[in-house]
Amino acid sequence: MKKIVVFTGAGVSADSGLATFRDSDGLWANYRIEDVCTPEALRDNRAQVVDFYNMRRREMLGKEPNAGHRAIAGLEKCFDVEVITQNVDNLHERAGSSRVTHLHGELTKLRSSRDPELIVPIDGWEQRLDATAPDGSLLRPHIVFFGEAVPMFERAAEIAGTADLMV
Protein backbone atom coordinates (compact mmCIF):
# COMPACT_ATOMS: atom_id res chain seq x y z
CA MET A 1 0.00 0.00 0.00
CA LYS A 2 1.35 3.43 -0.95
CA LYS A 3 2.30 5.72 1.93
CA ILE A 4 1.09 9.32 1.75
CA VAL A 5 2.32 11.91 4.21
CA VAL A 6 0.28 15.11 4.32
CA PHE A 7 1.88 18.24 5.81
CA THR A 8 -0.61 20.90 6.90
CA GLY A 9 -0.57 24.34 8.45
CA ALA A 10 -2.98 27.08 9.41
CA GLY A 11 -4.59 27.28 5.97
CA VAL A 12 -6.40 23.96 6.31
CA SER A 13 -8.08 25.04 9.55
CA ALA A 14 -8.74 28.61 8.39
CA ASP A 15 -11.53 27.22 6.21
CA SER A 16 -13.18 25.99 9.42
CA GLY A 17 -13.14 29.54 10.76
CA LEU A 18 -10.12 29.30 13.06
CA ALA A 19 -8.02 32.43 13.17
CA THR A 20 -4.54 32.11 11.74
CA PHE A 21 -1.60 33.85 13.35
CA ARG A 22 -0.14 35.94 10.57
CA ASP A 23 -3.11 37.16 8.51
CA SER A 24 -3.93 40.86 8.80
CA ASP A 25 -6.82 39.98 11.13
CA GLY A 26 -4.99 37.01 12.69
CA LEU A 27 -4.07 36.33 16.27
CA TRP A 28 -0.85 38.32 16.14
CA ALA A 29 -2.83 41.40 15.07
CA ASN A 30 -4.44 41.38 18.53
CA TYR A 31 -1.72 39.83 20.71
CA ARG A 32 2.02 40.27 20.95
CA ILE A 33 3.91 36.98 20.63
CA GLU A 34 6.10 38.03 23.55
CA ASP A 35 3.04 38.38 25.79
CA VAL A 36 1.36 35.01 25.21
CA CYS A 37 3.66 32.56 23.45
CA THR A 38 7.07 32.49 25.11
CA PRO A 39 8.47 30.76 28.18
CA GLU A 40 9.14 34.21 29.64
CA ALA A 41 5.50 35.22 29.22
CA LEU A 42 4.40 32.07 31.04
CA ARG A 43 6.84 32.81 33.87
CA ASP A 44 6.04 36.53 34.14
CA ASN A 45 2.30 36.60 33.40
CA ARG A 46 0.95 33.08 33.76
CA ALA A 47 -2.68 34.24 33.95
CA GLN A 48 -2.51 36.06 30.61
CA VAL A 49 -0.95 33.04 28.87
CA VAL A 50 -3.46 30.59 30.36
CA ASP A 51 -6.33 32.93 29.43
CA PHE A 52 -5.04 33.18 25.84
CA TYR A 53 -4.97 29.41 25.37
CA ASN A 54 -8.32 28.97 27.11
CA MET A 55 -9.72 31.46 24.57
CA ARG A 56 -8.15 29.43 21.75
CA ARG A 57 -9.77 26.24 23.11
CA ARG A 58 -13.18 27.93 23.29
CA GLU A 59 -12.74 29.08 19.69
CA MET A 60 -11.83 25.54 18.60
CA LEU A 61 -14.80 24.04 20.45
CA GLY A 62 -17.24 25.83 18.16
CA LYS A 63 -15.53 24.81 14.90
CA GLU A 64 -15.97 21.72 12.76
CA PRO A 65 -13.60 19.94 10.38
CA ASN A 66 -13.98 21.20 6.83
CA ALA A 67 -13.84 19.48 3.43
CA GLY A 68 -10.03 19.59 3.45
CA HIS A 69 -9.80 17.77 6.78
CA ARG A 70 -12.38 15.23 5.63
CA ALA A 71 -10.63 14.66 2.28
CA ILE A 72 -7.33 13.99 4.03
CA ALA A 73 -9.03 11.57 6.44
CA GLY A 74 -10.79 9.91 3.49
CA LEU A 75 -7.45 9.02 1.90
CA GLU A 76 -7.07 6.39 4.63
CA LYS A 77 -9.64 4.24 2.82
CA CYS A 78 -7.15 3.61 0.01
CA PHE A 79 -3.72 4.55 1.33
CA ASP A 80 -1.44 4.40 4.34
CA VAL A 81 -1.72 8.03 5.49
CA GLU A 82 0.05 10.05 8.14
CA VAL A 83 -0.56 13.72 8.81
CA ILE A 84 2.12 16.08 10.08
CA THR A 85 0.58 19.37 11.12
CA GLN A 86 1.75 22.68 12.46
CA ASN A 87 -1.76 23.22 13.81
CA VAL A 88 -2.58 22.87 17.50
CA ASP A 89 -6.30 22.19 16.94
CA ASN A 90 -7.86 18.71 16.83
CA LEU A 91 -9.78 19.08 13.57
CA HIS A 92 -7.77 16.41 11.73
CA GLU A 93 -8.60 13.89 14.44
CA ARG A 94 -12.25 14.93 14.55
CA ALA A 95 -12.43 14.47 10.76
CA GLY A 96 -11.23 10.89 11.19
CA SER A 97 -7.47 11.01 10.60
CA SER A 98 -6.00 8.26 12.74
CA ARG A 99 -2.30 9.18 12.69
CA VAL A 100 -1.57 12.84 13.31
CA THR A 101 1.74 14.28 14.51
CA HIS A 102 1.42 17.78 15.96
CA LEU A 103 4.69 19.67 15.54
CA HIS A 104 3.69 22.63 17.70
CA GLY A 105 1.67 20.85 20.39
CA GLU A 106 -2.02 20.38 21.04
CA LEU A 107 -4.62 22.63 22.63
CA THR A 108 -6.43 19.60 24.07
CA LYS A 109 -3.47 18.69 26.26
CA LEU A 110 -1.38 20.17 29.04
CA ARG A 111 2.10 19.28 30.16
CA SER A 112 4.23 19.44 33.25
CA SER A 113 6.29 22.59 33.58
CA ARG A 114 9.08 20.41 34.98
CA ASP A 115 8.97 17.38 32.64
CA PRO A 116 8.03 18.19 29.01
CA GLU A 117 7.30 14.50 28.35
CA LEU A 118 4.63 14.36 31.07
CA ILE A 119 1.58 15.22 28.96
CA VAL A 120 -2.02 14.96 30.16
CA PRO A 121 -5.39 15.63 28.52
CA ILE A 122 -7.03 18.83 29.67
CA ASP A 123 -9.91 18.38 32.10
CA GLY A 124 -12.71 20.02 30.12
CA TRP A 125 -11.89 23.02 27.92
CA GLU A 126 -10.44 25.43 30.46
CA GLN A 127 -7.05 25.17 32.11
CA ARG A 128 -7.19 26.21 35.74
CA LEU A 129 -4.41 28.59 36.72
CA ASP A 130 -3.38 26.34 39.63
CA ALA A 131 -3.73 22.98 37.83
CA THR A 132 -0.89 20.63 38.71
CA ALA A 133 0.70 17.69 36.92
CA PRO A 134 1.11 14.25 38.51
CA ASP A 135 4.69 15.27 39.38
CA GLY A 136 3.36 18.22 41.43
CA SER A 137 4.54 20.95 39.05
CA LEU A 138 2.21 23.50 37.52
CA LEU A 139 0.68 22.44 34.23
CA ARG A 140 1.26 24.58 31.17
CA PRO A 141 -0.30 24.52 27.71
CA HIS A 142 1.10 21.67 25.61
CA ILE A 143 2.24 24.19 23.03
CA VAL A 144 5.71 24.81 21.63
CA PHE A 145 6.43 28.41 22.54
CA PHE A 146 8.65 30.68 20.47
CA GLY A 147 12.25 30.04 21.44
CA GLU A 148 11.61 26.40 22.41
CA ALA A 149 12.79 23.32 20.55
CA VAL A 150 10.21 21.41 18.51
CA PRO A 151 10.19 18.00 20.22
CA MET A 152 8.33 16.22 17.40
CA PHE A 153 10.67 17.47 14.66
CA GLU A 154 12.76 14.28 14.47
CA ARG A 155 9.63 12.12 14.49
CA ALA A 156 8.16 14.21 11.66
CA ALA A 157 11.38 13.83 9.65
CA GLU A 158 11.23 10.05 10.15
CA ILE A 159 7.61 9.97 8.97
CA ALA A 160 8.40 12.13 5.94
CA GLY A 161 11.25 9.79 5.05
CA THR A 162 8.82 6.87 4.72
CA ALA A 163 6.55 8.63 2.21
CA ASP A 164 5.93 7.44 -1.31
CA LEU A 165 4.16 10.77 -1.80
CA MET A 166 4.42 13.94 0.28
CA VAL A 167 1.54 16.42 -0.02
Map each language-model feature to its residues.
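Conserved catalytic core of sirtuin-type NAD+-dependent deacylases
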Residues: M1-M166
